[in-house]
C-alpha cells in the first residue's frame, strides 16, 4: 500500500475550492484564498494539495508508530461519513456531540464507557438479571444516549494520538482540548474558519458532501497505509487481511501519553 494519491481536478470536482460569501470570511484565512467569484471566496488549491499530502503523511506516521486517530465531525453533513471512514480504517470517531472534557477529563469519560459496557451485558440477559421490564426500558434509553455520545470511542482505550476534524468552528472545543494536551490536529479550514490551534490545516470547503467524502476517504487511506507499515514492521501482511486488524487495547481506564507533532 501507499498513501492515496489525488489530483487538483478531483478537488475541483468535489467543490473543495468554494469558500463562503465574502462577508462571512475569517481574515486569518487570507493567505489561503485565491480570490473572489460572484461574492464567494475561492480557496487556493495550489496550497490545498501539498497541505493535504502533508496532513496525510502526519496521519500515516502516527498510525505507523502505533498511534490512534480520532475522527471528529458532528455537523449533519459530516456525521455519517466520519463514522463510516473511521470504522473502515479501524479508528475512532465522535459524530454526535463533543462532550466537554472528552479528552481533558478522560478518567470520567472512561467511567461512562465502562457504564455503557456494563449496560450492554445486563441488557443482553434481560429479565434474567433480576430487573423489571420498566427498569430494563429505562436502562435501554440510558444506553442509547451513551452509545450516541461515546459509541465511536468505546474501544479506544486511552487518549488519541491525533485528531482529524471537519469544521473547526463547530469543533473548537475539541481543538482546545487537544491543544491543551499536546495532541496534534489535522483539520479542514474553510474561508470562515480559524486556523489557530490546527497543526496540519487543509484549506477547503467543509460543507459540501462530496468535499467531506473526499477528505475522509484520503485520511482513511493514510491510516490504512500507516497500519500496513506498522504490520510490515511486525512481519504481518495487512494486504492479505480483509479488514483492518483490531487494536490491542491497554487496560480499561489507562491513559496513554499522546504522540507529539
Swiss-Prot record:
Keyword Oxidoreductase attributed: no
Pfam families in UniProt: Ribosomal_S2
Any Gene Ontology biological process: translation
Keywords: Ribonucleoprotein, Ribosomal protein
Keyword Ribosomal protein part of the UniProt annotation: yes
Gene3D superfamilies to which the protein is assigned, alphabetical: Glucose-6-phosphate isomerase like protein, domain 1, Helix hairpin bin
Family under the similarity heading: Belongs to the universal ribosomal protein uS2 family.
NCBIfam families xref list: rpsB_bact
Protein name: Small ribosomal subunit protein uS2
Organism: Rhodospirillum centenum (strain ATCC 51521 / SW)
Lineage of origin: Bacteria, Pseudomonadati, Pseudomonadota, Alphaproteobacteria, Rhodospirillales
Gene name of the record: rpsB
